[in-house]
Regions:
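Short, acidic loop-to-helix structural element flanking the phosphoryl-transfer center
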Residues: 56-84, 94, 120
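Metal-dependent phosphoesterase signature
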Residues: 32-70
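Structural motif corresponding to alpha-helix initiation and N-cap regions
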Residues: 13-16, 28, 66, 70, ...
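Conserved phosphate-coupling serine/threonine residues in phosphotransfer and NTP-handling enzymes
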Residues: 86-88
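Asp-based, Mg2+/Mn2+-dependent phosphohydrolase catalytic module
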Residues: 90, 94-183
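Short helix-capping segments at alpha-helix termini
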Residues: 7-12, 39-41, 101-105
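Helix-loop "lid/cap" segments that line or gate small-molecule binding pockets
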Residues: 5-7, 26-40, 96
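Short, small-residue-biased leader/transition segments that mark boundaries at the very start
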Residues: 1-2
Length: 183
């Protein structure tokens, strides 16, 4: 893939632990954390190349899904409108949804790669665009919690994900959403 072809100013691909440590960050923040010795221009050039490789792979192979994800999405979508807000590139969400044929469960989605806006602004944008009355943002990082708070939306911590969060209700398995979001 990208690092197999050689990137002269990078010693090698980031480790799994390093990648997990930057999940949910904006492109600028994650590249600065992974490669502090590179310029901002080089960060974005490298990030764009990584996104191209990632999106191609994702569309063809998909990703690792949480247990009972599709069954839970199907049940939830019959009771509630579902949406996605992410700090990903513009093509990531469509690639992921295409790979797993999950489009039918989501009414709308937004990301920083499409709008250039911060996650909290995109949460607010989706809430306003879809006239949501009682939204809840489910996320797995402190950055998600902060974004939900800034957007004025209640936050539910997905403790099975990548980050640690304090002071928020949590679920430890994806299907628990069915119980919590009943009414």
């Amino acid at each position: 893939m990208l690092f197999r072809s050689g990137v002269p100013d990078i010693e090698g691909p980031p480790t799994r632990a390093q990648l997990e440590g930057v999940m949910g960050m904006t492109a600028e923040d994650l590249m600065a954390k992974l490669y502090p010795h590179l310029s901002k221009e080089r960060h974005m050039e490298l990030f764009d190349r990584c996104c191209q490789v990632e999106n191609t792979y994702l569309r063809e192979h998909g990703g690792v899904l949480y247990p009972q994800l599709e069954e839970t999405l199907e049940a939830l979508s019959q009771k509630l409108p579902l949406f996605i807000v992410s700090n990903c590139n513009a093509e990531y969400i469509p690639c992921f949804l295409d790979a797993h044929q999950l489009h039918r469960y989501f009414r709308d989605w937004e990301c920083i790669g499409r709008t250039g806006k911060q996650k909290w602004e995109n949460i607010r944008l989706v809430v306003e665009r879809n006239h949501l009355q009682r939204p809840v943002y489910v996320g797995d990082t402190a950055m998600d919690q902060e974004a939900a708070q800034k957007a004025g939306v209640p936050f539910l911590h997905a403790a099975y994900g990548f980050g640690d969060v304090t002071g928020a209700p949590e679920i430890t398995q994806f299907p628990q959403l069915l119980e919590l979001l009943q009414d």
